[in-house]
Amino acid sequence: MKRFFPGLVSAALIVASSATAAPFTYTNARFGTVCTFPVDIFTDRRPEPDNGDGQQWLSADGASLICSGINNVNDDTPKSFVAEEKAAKEAGYEITYSKTGKNWAVLSGQKDGKIFYERRLFGKDGVIRTVWIDYPPAVKAKYDPLVGAIAGSLKGP
């Protein structure tokens, strides 16, 4: 029941947060990464990379959503991932929020002038599943209510 309830809440929040936005659930064939988001907002589905690791969607107002997976070849943990990202000295990249749990990590901040939100799940199957959302500050009021539900919908097998 604990695993089912957050998914149900996430789906309900997506619908409630944008009454006109139809939810779409994407499942990555290679890694089994699953995320649900409003397809009425993220309308431009980009071509899948040749390696099949995920998918990207763009919105008309400059937002981007990526749902993907990677093999955890370095045996990263949520804490090591956050520590590494916080230590990064990349220009235009600032983390303003981070949190970790037993098998997940969340980062938020600004990158290249956009607000970003990233959630990663560290699977027992050796796969890190990620949802990344970024958007211009000018549309913050539109996307802030959606981010939590979209990130909360991230799951894997």
Which functions belong to the PLM regions below?
Residues R46-P145:
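Conserved polar/disulfide-associated segments of primarily extracytoplasmic proteins
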Residues M1-F4:
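Positively charged n-region of N-terminal signal peptides that target proteins for export
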